[in-house]
Amino acid sequence: MPIGVPKVPFRSPGDEDASWVDVINRLYRERLLFLGQEVDSEISNQLIGLMVFLSIEDDTKDLYLFINSPGGWVIPGLGIYDTMQFVQPDVQTICMGLAASMGSFILVGGEITKRLAFPHARVMIHQPASSFYEAQTGEFILEAEELLKLRETITRVYVQRTGKSLWVISEDMERDVFMSATEAQAHGLVDLVAVE
């Protein structure tokens, strides 16, 4: 029998008694956000809403985005990335487990000098993909053009945020490139590796 989402006590400033809230809600109140699934429109909208709300609530305290994601949809991922750049507080990104594909793109979008990977984390970058086999010929051409534009955008961001050359990033994105935490640090995807 499932136990559901664990509840923890939370006391608002000025309240005498604590109320019980689910653990994720409690962590959000501490500005700790989680991307622990494939990136899709639903999780993207939730994270965007939380970042905007927490930014309005206090624009001086950093946000912490913990990432354990196999990647996912490109456009919702770009929405998360753009919001991270838009909100006033710095967004610190922490890779735990895996940040692959769009997960690594969001990871690299954290505030430079505040991007961290746990020691056994893995990071993977590659080019965006599409399901061409489902499209008609005309749609196929349009989709290929859009995919090339998205690849250029993603490549430019990696170049800007890693300090690596366009040639190096373009070469790496030709195939799935998996990296350890220290390799990701050497590649400029993260700034720090947590110690064991």
Curated annotation (Swiss-Prot):
One Pfam family linked to the record: CLP_protease
Cysteines paired by S-S bonds: none
Localization per record: Plastid, Chloroplast stroma
GO cellular component: a single term: chloroplast stroma
EC number: 3.4.21.92
Active-site residues annotated for this sequence: S101, H126
GO biological process terms, semicolon-separated: protein quality control for misfolded or incompletely synthesized proteins
Record-level Gene Ontology MF annotations: ATP-dependent peptidase activity; ATPase binding; serine-type endopeptidase activity
UniProt catalytic activity: Hydrolysis of proteins to small peptides in the presence of ATP and magnesium. alpha-casein is the usual test substrate. In the absence of ATP, only oligopeptides shorter than five residues are hydrolyzed (such as succinyl-Leu-Tyr-|-NHMec, and Leu-Tyr-Leu-|-Tyr-Trp, in which cleavage of the -Tyr-|-Leu- and -Tyr-|-Trp bonds also occurs)
Alphabetically ordered keywords of this record: Chloroplast, Hydrolase, Plastid, Protease, Serine protease
SUPFAM superfamilies named in the record: ClpP/crotonase
Function: Cleaves peptides in various proteins in a process that requires ATP hydrolysis. Has a chymotrypsin-like activity. Plays a major role in the degradation of misfolded proteins.
Subunit structure: Component of the chloroplastic Clp protease core complex.
Record-stated family: Belongs to the peptidase S14 family.
Protein name: ATP-dependent Clp protease proteolytic subunit
